[in-house]
Amino acid sequence: MKEDRIVFIFGPTAVGKSNILFHFPKNKAEIINVDSIQVYKEFNIASSKPSKNLMKHIKHHLVDFLDPEKEYTLGIFYEQALRIVKEIRQKKKIPIFVGGTAFYFKHLKDGFPSTPLVTSEIRIYVNNLLYLKGKSYLLKELKNVDPIRFNMLNKNDIYRIKRSLEVYYQTGIPISQFEKKQNSEFKNILIIGLKRSFEDLKTRISIRINEMLNSGLLSEIKGLFSKGYNENTPAFKGIGYNEFLLWKSRPCYSLNDIISLINKNSFLYAKRQMTFFAKISNVLWFHPEDDLVSILNLIFNVDKEI
């Protein structure tokens, strides 16, 4: 392993990313979390944060540190990631990025897009448009001013919809024209993708959701609501949390309805993740269990019996 190399390990939700980390040698690497919800404090169960045992086995960064009311952006993540990589390298360890937020991995590999800042007045204006005219109006407006960005975005990703319009209203230039590839800070990247069949993923997602419920997800959700967290809380955008906003605001939704919706949304998200990851070049794809020895050898150059 060259000293300047970093490692990416990514894959869809429930593929088994955390499980392979228990097999990593102690004190040879540190993990940089690549998950936009696990960064938040208090939002623990549905975000599938690494267990205490796993974090004791191998050090994790960017987990459970951010106030749920704070927005976490690509720019913040990118800046923190650069700093942490330097710190890990100073310890003569391997920086390993692990997670499922494909958008973050893309820009770690390709470089950070140089989009402009926008004023608070523009942000307020776009928020007012959302409040007065609704998401459908924002989508229609985005399609008119930036069809490239419109076709790229998840139509439920209200944060990036707003951000795209903010940049356009601020500059008169579509955000898609700003987001050209920059030079990445990282030149020597080992990219490992984890995959399973969709049938296997669907089963594992269902099992995981049942485990979350048995671990106290409902109590966690009620506790979050009691603290005043709501639909305006950035952490509530995560799957497994966002669906409970319906449960709170619309009594016609039963708990079983919400669980079914979480299952559905989780599987659709896993499919979107795989579609996005498939567009990233130079990925070495492995099954997280069948190919575990190969993964360990590739990263650490060690043989291990499983």
From Swiss-Prot:
One of its GO terms (molecular function) is ATP binding. It catalyses: adenosine(37) in tRNA + dimethylallyl diphosphate = N(6)-dimethylallyladenosine(37) in tRNA + diphosphate. Keywords: ATP-binding, Magnesium, Nucleotide-binding, Transferase, tRNA processing. The record marks 101, 123 as: Interaction with substrate tRNA. ATP binds at residues 11-18. One of its GO terms (biological process) is tRNA modification. InterPro entries: Dimethylallyltransferase, IPT, P-loop_NTPase. Its EC number is 2.5.1.75. Residues 35-38 are annotated as: Interaction with substrate tRNA. Substrate binds at residues 13-18. It comes from the Bacteria. Its cofactor is Mg(2+). HAMAP family: IPP_trans. Catalyzes the transfer of a dimethylallyl group onto the adenine at position 37 in tRNAs that read codons beginning with uridine, leading to the formation of N6-(dimethylallyl)adenosine (i(6)A). Monomer. This is tRNA dimethylallyltransferase. The lineage of its organism: Bacteria, Pseudomonadati, Spirochaetota, Spirochaetia, Spirochaetales.
